[in-house]
Amino acid sequence: MSRYPNEVDVVIVGSGPTGAAYARILSERAPGARIAMLEVGPTVSDPPGAHVKNIVDDAERARAQVRSQGPAAETATVTNPGAVKAGQRRARAGTYLLDDGYAQDGEDGLPVAAFSSNVGGMGAHWTAACPRPGDSERIGFLDEDGALDELLSEGERLLGVTSDAFDAAPFSGLVRERLAAEVDAERPADRRVQRMPLAVHRRDDGRLVWSGSDVVFGDVTRANRGFSLHDESLVTRVLVADGRASGVEVRDLRDGQTHRIAARFVVVAADALRTPQVLWASGIRPEALGRYLNDQAQIVFASRLRDVEAPATREGGDGALSETSGVSWVPFTDDLPFHGQIMQLDASPIPLADDDPVVPGSIVGLGLFCAKDLQASDRVAFDDSRVDAYGMPAMRIHYTLTDRDRAVIERAKREIVRLGNAVGEPLDDRPFVMPLGSSLHYQGTVRMGAADDGASVCDPHSEVWGVPGLFVAGNGVIPTATACNPTLTAVALAVRGARRIAERLSSQTASEQVSGAVTAG
């Protein structure tokens, strides 16, 4: 007997934060809807979708990370910054690399393009930074009537975003004061140096709780009897009947059997590389599919606060600082086109002398993220003659930095040194440019557009052009070049799509009720 339903109202492919947002909004606005969520990876945390940082036991947390690494579960991952600087091509714990096709001859490629396969997706492993986009990062056609800010606020509600979880971190005010002196002049109030908005909260006992898909699901989804979550389930294609999405074909990875689930609506939220893969495998191939792929070049540097003393007391769950204690934000602006994520650390990423002890929180890790110069030629393509470890069309990344990209990266290197000197004493000889793909913020591959002009995959409600009933979700929907962490924006766009489905479900139900009443009469 199949563990899948034969028919539902909505199928959601993928269980990351955006897939969870669809489930949450539909549970709130269409409580009678039958929803099936399908995830290729296993359940690695409790409740399902919870962030692995919330797992207290180190060994159990490590097992959860390994189980998230899909077909590369036993492959070595990065354990320290030195491995990256030494040129080792490794994924972070909880993720796995695209093993082939990540770069083509004469191109830059994305050498560390990575995935996570688990309930919660990368939302079980992320840094939880949730800044709002600014200036050219914003989506103009959603800004005209003020829709974007309301959607971002709703995204913050679903993700549980706060800005005060690290208020007790030592020296964070000093770090922000020194950064502000360098960059705040002539900036509007909302784009000045400030605390980083994070999807994290501190419990009454002092312990930090990091948001994953479990927080986005919320109690309303978990209590929804019409909602079901199926892990270890590979969606191989979206079914289309009479030009409209009509369901999915799914392979049960536990026994290898294939099943079909009929649905009124299908939402593909598989990530920015696998969502276009599912559409391609389904024969749904709009001109912009997989194109406008963009990552954020990432430059890192470290400095040390020298003129500080260890605080008399240290607040927190067990008295220890988290590695992200004192997270500060230098917002993107068009004049300074970088997103700055500044983290205070307990330990130095650079070896220090044995007789030079580190004051907790005095090591400052600076990271600047650069927005990509968008071009249609940057894309993930698919090879119908070859398959990946899951049996899906093999990916081929085409990705090239433009002259403008290289100029922005050089400017970012100068800027991060300036900021590092402003904060304290630099620990690095020079800035380090992370391998392309390191940000994990891949965007644009199923991008949203205001018109069906061949330059976008979906409409402003995330519905795929020309395929009614098929919606896409995730960072790939974002149509602008962003430098900030994209999760909040992606969840905000998912909220809009979910509302549209809820409206249609309500309208269809009302029509069916009227039709039934007329027939009975």
What are these regions, as identified by a protein language model?
Residues 63, 73-82, 88-92, 106-108, ...:
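Conserved redox-cofactor binding core of oxidoreductases
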Residues 90-115, 119-122, 286-406, 439-444, ...:
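FAD cofactor-binding and catalytic pocket of flavoenzymes
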Residues 16-17, 273, 477:
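Residue-level detector of alpha-helix initiation sites
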Residues 28-60, 64, 238, 249-318, ...:
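Glycine-rich loop(s) and the adjacent beta-strand/alpha-helix scaffold that form part
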Residues 10-37:
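N-terminal Rossmann-like FAD-binding beta1-loop-alpha1 element of flavoenzymes
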Residues 42-75, 79, 114-128:
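Conserved N-terminal glycine-rich FAD pyrophosphate-binding loop of Rossmann-like flavoproteins
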Residues 480-501:
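A conserved FAD-binding loop/helix module that cradles the flavin
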Residues 194-199, 230-231, 236-241, 407-481, ...:
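A glycine-rich dinucleotide-binding beta-alpha-beta segment and adjacent secondary-structure elements
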